[in-house]
Curated annotation (Swiss-Prot):
Family of the protein in this entry: In the central section; belongs to the AAA ATPase family. In the C-terminal section; belongs to the peptidase M41 family.
Entry's EC annotation: 3.4.24.-
Record gene name: ftsH
Listed HAMAP family: FtsH (MF_01458)
Topology within the bilayer: Multi-pass membrane protein
Lineage: Bacteria, Bacillati, Bacillota, Bacilli, Bacillales
Protein name: ATP-dependent zinc metalloprotease FtsH
Ranges in the topological domain labelled Extracellular: 28-114
Length: 679
């Protein structure tokens, strides 16, 4: 009702302004000259007045008329005292022809002075009110011109608290930390009886997609107390002082509803380090941060208010914000391990019909490094693939296809690839595959394909045998050797190389440099860490670069050590492929024929020199049939013929034929997917 009333007043004011503007433009725009009464009397006597009207006022006559002695008739007005002599002059006046004027006597204006006063100021009042409404309508987010300093925090209603702790999986320890906060709010005597103090602030830190906001929503659903939610970017806006004002208003509202919880999402937007770095001198943001520090733990205590914040950039937060008394507890929300991934998959599979062949444990093993958001997206993609084939349940084939789509993008079987490039891709991926199988400490080769997906012309999926949180020196060296396998395979097979190993070199060089500069794995330089000013990220609130803690001579030694590691790994990789040249050619020829090989087929080819039995081969072909949906989609719900892809017949590589170094090859092929780095 209040909104309808405001809209009615607003449109009424617009109507009045339009009427006023129209009346002004439609009024008599004729110019009128003010003349003295003596001049008027003289012209009247000379017969130069052709129209005349008289309007009696309090003590004078208002005389209006028109002269006829100009090229253009001129209108005039004058004032005359009300006397018998003036009345005789006016009422006996004659026009130039000697005919007495048909004198028009206008009625006297009996309007009071107060009415005239208010009539003059009403237009200004209307303009002021209209300006006020225009400003109020211009304020975003439903706020008004006089309350832009109010907090934008939203109190979560009871009916909207849908998330519970049972909806959070794969983060048992993190969930337990927050369960204590909820228990304190429900039964504070349990903790106060032994002198315990609940943390004033809890900071959730972790990579994107790990469930930090979901944990906060679960706290809101379980707490049973008022829950305020706000984003860190909602504090600072265009007006100076708004940020600090909104912080004060937020805590004032929280005090009125204590005990309560305040959740600040992406707190790094307002809690960046203060300093002279790039953007570090932002006075408005620093003022907002200072006010937040005072409200969290300042001179006046805020009892019963618990603050939960989330960020994925804890390294750039101000140290004063992280000290005990403000954020007493920091909870690291990492990506789930294999057991956590299985629990997350169970949560997201509740409303999805799964076929009997779906094994969530196997999927969890196949997806190392996936966050909770990645796993949710994976099952959603699998459901979309199943719906595309008009299936009523999600099978393992659909999930395998969804994993490939999430890792490398949709298959592009319609992409035209020349036989020469297809041959290069096949031997390149076969090189990665054979080296990965033969190395003891390398990641397990799970799948290899030459089917283009996304920007990749082919890729090999290398998965760790188990979840790990650190790597040994032999494992790092074997990883470099595996990355160089594609380039070495091209060299030993064709005698020339292509640009397809661009990403492989980038990653291999990065690992080797970290071994020397960060991990202390160089025998020549010893167990030391060398910090480079250009290696860190540039962000607001901190210096642009760190000082280099080593000399130019040491920098030269670092380059030599990195070069030595790469060359030794390259030589080792070349030795492996030359010793297993038959396996390399067999895998490459089979890839040209089948395009995709799974882990069991790869092991059988390398160790036994043949493919496994027909049962497994048929399962593989059925998987390939499911991926055909990326080429043709049945829009009209009618069955279409599956396009027949003619596979190139395996041929011995022609080493005499030169390889064209087309720069487009680099753009079309990224032979090994980055996700095999996930550990």
């Amino acid at each position: 009702m209040n909104r309808i009333f405001r809209n009615t007043i607003f449109y009424l004011l617009i109507f009045l302004v339009i009427v006023g503007i129209v009346s002004v433009f439609n009024s008599d725009q004729t110019e009128t000259e003010n003349v003295s009464f003596n001049e008027f009397a003289e012209r009247l006597e000379n017969g130069q007045v052709q129209e005349l009207s008289v309007k009696p006022e309090r003590q004078v006559y208002l005389v209006r008329g028109q002269f006829n002695d100009q090229a253009e008739d001129e209108f005039f007005q004058t004032y005359a005292l009300r006397s018998e002599q003036t009345a005789e002059l006016l009422f006996n006046a004659e026009d130039p022809t000697g005919t007495p004027f048909n004198l028009e006597i206008e009625p006297a204006d009996e309007t009071s002075g107060w009415v005239q006063f208010f009539t003059g100021i009403i237009p200004f009042i209307i303009i002021f009110i209209l300006f006020f409404f225009l400003l109020s309508q211009a304020q975003g987010g439903g706020s008004r011109v006089m309350n832009f300093g109010k907090s934008k925090a939203k109190m979560v209603n009871e009916d909207k608290k849908k998330a519970k702790f049972k909806d959070v999986a794969g983060a048992d320890e993190e969930k337990q930390e927050l369960v204590e906060v909820v228990e304190f709010l429900k039964d504070p005597r349990k903790f106060s009886a032994i002198g315990a103090r609940i943390p004033k602030g809890v900071l959730l830190v972790g990579p994107p997609g790990t469930g930090k906001t979901l944990l906060a929503r679960a706290v809101a659903g379980e707490a049973g107390v008022p829950f305020f939610s706000i984003s860190g970017s909602d504090f600072v806006e265009m007006f100076v002082g708004v940020g600090a004002s909104r912080v004060r208003d937020l805590f004032e509202n929280a005090k009125k509803n204590a005990p309560c919880i305040i959740f600040i999402d992406e707190i790094d937007a307002v809690g960046r380090q203060r300093g002279a770095g790039l953007g570090g001198g932002h006075d408005e943001r620093e003022q907002t941060l200072n006010q937040l520090l005072v409200e969290m733990d300042g001179f006046s205590a805020n009892e019963g208010i618990i603050i939960i914040a989330a960020t994925n950039r804890a390294d750039i937060l101000d140290p004063a914000l992280l000290r005990p008394g403000r954020f007493d507890r920091q909870i690291q929300v990492n990506r789930p391990d294999v057991n956590g991934r299985e629990e997350v998959l169970k949560v997201h599979a509740r409303n999805k019909p799964l076929n009997d062949d779906v094994n969530l444990k196997t999927i969890a093993t196949r997806t190392p490094g996936f966050s909770g958001a990645d796993l949710e997206n994976l099952l959603n993609e699998a459901a979309l693939v199943a719906a595309r084939h008009d299936h009523t349940k999600i099978s393992m084939i659909h999930i395998e296809e969804a994993i490939d789509r999430v890792i490398a993008g949709p298959a592009k079987k319609s992409r035209v690839i020349s036989p020469k490039e297809k041959k290069i891709v096949a031997w390149h991926e076969a090189g990665h595959t054979v080296v990965g199988v033969k190395l003891e400490n390398a990641d397990m080769v799970h799948k290899v394909t030459i089917v283009p997906r996304g920007m990749a012309g082919g890729y090999a999926v290398m998965l760790p045998k188990e979840d790990r949180y650190f790597m040994t020196q032999p494992e790092l060296l074997d990883k470099i050797i595996g990355l160089l396998g594609g380039r070495v395979a091209e060299e030993v097979t064709f005698g020339e190389v292509s640009t397809g190993a661009h990403n492989d070199f980038q990653r291999a060089t990065g690992i080797a440099r970290k071994m020397v500069t960060e991990y202390g794995m160089s025998e020549k330089l010893g167990p030391m860490q060398f910090i480079s000013g250009s290696g860190g990220q540039v962000f607001l609130g901190r210096d642009i670069q760190n000082e280099q803690n080593y000399s130019d001579a040491i920098a030269h030694e670092i380059d030599l050590e990195v070069q030595r590691i790469i060359k030794e790994c390259y030589a080792r990789c070349k030795q492996i492929l030359l010793e297993n040249k038959d396996s390399l050619d067999l895998v490459a020829k089979t890839l040209l024929d089948m395009e995709t090989l799974d882990a069991e087929q790869i092991k059988s080819l390398v160790h036994e020199g043949k493919l496994p039995d027909d049962h497994h081969l048929n399962a593989h072909l059925e998987k390939e049939k499911a991926s055909e949906s990326d080429v043709k989609v049945n829009i009209n719900s009618k069955k279409e013929e599956t396009p027949q892809v003619e596979a190139e017949q395996p041929q011995e590589p022609n080493t005499d034929e030169p390889i064209e170094k087309d720069p487009s090859v680099e753009d079309n092929r990224s032979f090994e997917d980055d996700t095999n780095k996930k550990e």
